[in-house]
């Protein structure tokens, strides 16, 4: 094999690894209960593939705290991350209820309808409401 063929083979291997890393990223990771900030994150592999995921943690004061924590995780997997927006989530597991609302002062408002669709993949038996009201 010449150098170009070796390089091409290596790049294909790296691309396959990043596709597998992207496929392994969970769509939803949020706190088990309470009211907390959340961000939508577009996770991007080394090529053109990407997916939107939802992250929200009660122990994070700012939307940026959530994004930075998760961005570090994605970087270790060889993935890039972008944040198109955020908001808040109210999670009541006893009532099987989620409410998505508000916005992030730093990132803007996430697409709450898309957030609802993503949350429904993990919580199909929940009532999920969205609202553009509140902060």
Swiss-Prot record:
Binding annotation for substrate: 37, 104-106
Keyword entries, A-Z: Differentiation, Sexual differentiation
Active site (record annotation): 63
Keyword flag Nucleotide-binding: no
Domain of life, per lineage: Eukaryota
Entry-linked Pfam families: Ocnus
One Gene Ontology biological process: sex differentiation
Gene Ontology molecular function: any one: protein histidine phosphatase activity
Record's GO cellular component terms: cytosol
Keyword Nucleotidyltransferase carried by entry: no
Similarity section: Belongs to the janus family.
Function: JanA and janB regulate somatic sex differentiation.
Protein name (database record): Sex-regulated protein janus-A
Organism from which the protein derives: Drosophila mauritiana
